[in-house]
UniProtKB/Swiss-Prot annotation:
Keyword flag Iron: yes
Catalytic activity: (2E)-4-hydroxy-3-methylbut-2-enyl diphosphate + oxidized [flavodoxin] + H2O + 2 H(+) = 2-C-methyl-D-erythritol 2,4-cyclic diphosphate + reduced [flavodoxin]
Species per Swiss-Prot/TrEMBL record: Treponema pallidum (strain Nichols)
Gene3D superfamilies from the UniProt entry: Dihydropteroate synthase-like, Sulfite Reductase Hemoprotein, domain 1
InterPro entries, alphabetized: Dihydropteroate_synth-like_sf, IspG_bac, IspG_bac-typ, NO2/SO3_Rdtase_4Fe4S_sf
UniProt binding sites for [4Fe-4S] cluster: C310, C313, C345, E352
Function: Converts 2C-methyl-D-erythritol 2,4-cyclodiphosphate (ME-2,4cPP) into 1-hydroxy-2-methyl-2-(E)-butenyl 4-diphosphate.
Source superkingdom: Bacteria
Entry note: cofactor: Binds 1 [4Fe-4S] cluster.
Essential cofactor(s): [4Fe-4S] cluster
Protein name: 4-hydroxy-3-methylbut-2-en-1-yl diphosphate synthase (flavodoxin)
Pathway: Isoprenoid biosynthesis; isopentenyl diphosphate biosynthesis via DXP pathway; isopentenyl diphosphate from 1-deoxy-D-xylulose 5-phosphate: step 5/6
UniProt entry keywords in alphabetical sequence: 4Fe-4S, Iron, Iron-sulfur, Isoprene biosynthesis, Metal-binding, Oxidoreductase
Any GO BP: terpenoid biosynthetic process
Length: 404
């Protein structure tokens, strides 16, 4: 037996009183639109709108433990991430000492921060003593409902948003068994696993609804594109709760970006998704830049530098790869709405790069700079050593860039 019908939150497999009150659904229109929510805004922390017509914020997660870290170094790094386009950063808070450090960190940055809590609900309570923007909990491992209620009441009192994170790896057994019984192949199909995610999410959302708490973001994550897309589609068809998009355990740089791009592009094209994180076994900077580019290509984020560059071939007259590595971070930190082209030879530049506001290209024994297809500077590099060549090229590029 297979099931292709929509998921009903009123028929949750949780049972045993865990879903006593059905979720008051606010059905979406066919174009989908999440309800509006503002996170942050407490004390000195920047207020960040999401859902509704708000731009889609980019999130990353801090990659190291807080214990033993220098807080000022973290604050400085957060500023760098913000300049690249990051809007929110989530921190793992696994113990009391980390919670104390997290509260201290919140007091020192304008960046909206999220506390990621598992197992011990008291850590969530402590984190909300500071100007935290949002607390992420997984009710599946927080414990009894009274603990979730305590978190909700503290969030209400402090004006803190909550994100309920539901992952395929931590679905309640009762949900999996109930859903598996309705499918011929049990939990093996994409639809079954997606439905289990949605049923779990609805059960948690219904409990928060029962407590009259609506400062909520939900995430339904799987490690495959198909399950992630299907689960978020099913949920979005029946609720306007803002959704945080992500593919969990997406993998290293290349495969992780591919998975996130495929999932996000399908969902964002339907206006599903209020915030995003590209989860990578790589740097936070790459997570932010990948999310930024995905949103831009999906028409969901405007402004900033658009960097185009050729892949490089045997005609190379200019080291494209090295130049991009040197300049990428600075270019993406600029607030200018421009296109920059970095080309290896005259085949691509300035011809194929003529649309760029500023371009640089190799040309036999020289490097040329062009603006909107017109050559504005040429530098002879044949007799220059590598270091001198780099210095002169970078200085000229910086001068041309500053003139835009």
């Amino acid at each position: 037996m297979d099931s292709s019908a929509g998921v009903s939150p009123c028929n949750s497999p949780y049972g045993s009183g865990l879903l006593d009150v059905p979720l008051k659904l606010r059905p979406r229109a066919s174009h989908y639109r999440a309800r509006s929510l503002v996170i942050g805004g407490k004390e000195h922390v920047r207020a960040l709108p999401l859902g509704g017509d708000a731009p889609i914020p980019i999130q990353t997660m801090w990659k190291e433990p807080l214990i033993g870290a220098d807080l000022q170094s973290i604050v400085d790094r957060l500023l760098e991430l913000e300049q690249l386009g990051c809007d929110v950063v989530r921190f793992a808070v696994p113990d009391r000492e980390s919670a104390e450090l997290f509260v201290a960190l919140c007091a020192r940055t304008r960046m909206p921060l999220v506390a990621d809590i598992h197992f011990d609900y008291r850590l969530a309570l402590r984190c909300m003593d500071g100007p935290v923007a949002k607390v992420r909990i997984n009710p599946g491992n927080i414990g009894v409902r009274e603990r979730v209620r305590a978190v909700v009441e503290k969030a209400r009192a402090t004006g803190t948003a909550l994100r309920i994170g539901v992952n395929t790896g931590s679905l309640p057994g009762v949900v999996k068994r109930a859903v598996a019984a309705r499918y011929a192949d049990g939990m093996q199909s994409v639809n079954a696993r997606a439905e289990a995610l949605v049923q779990t999410a609805f059960a948690e959302a219904a409990y928060l609804d029962q407590l009259h708490f609506d400062r909520v973001v939900l995430s339904l994550k799987a490690s495959t594109v198909a399950e992630t897309v299907r689960a978020n589609e099913l949920f979005a068809q029946q609720s306007d709760i803002p959704l945080h998009l992500g593919v969990t355990e997406a993998g290293p740089l290349v495969s992780g970006i591919v998975k996130s791009t495929l999932a996000f592009s399908q969902l964002l094209s339907r206006n599903i998704g209020a915030t995003v994180r590209v989860s990578l076994s790589d740097s936070m900077e790459h997570e932010v830049l990948a999310a930024r580019e995905i949103l831009a290509e999906c028409g969901k984020r405007a402004g900033g530098v658009r960097l185009v560059s050729c892949p490089r071939c045997g005609r190379i007259g200019f080291d494209v790869h090295a130049f991009v590595r040197r300049w990428q971070k600075e270019l993406f930190s600029l607030k200018k709405d421009i296109t920059v082209a970095v080309m290896g030879c005259v085949v691509n530049g300035p011809g194929e790069g003529k649309h760029a506001d500023l371009g640089i290209s190799g040309a036999e024994d020289s490097v040329i700079f062009f603006k909107r297809g017109k050559i504005v500077r040429r530098i002879q590099v044949r007799d220059l050593c590598a270091d001198e060549r780099t210095r002169i090229i970078d200085a000229a590029f910086k001068e041309e860039l500053s003139s835009l």
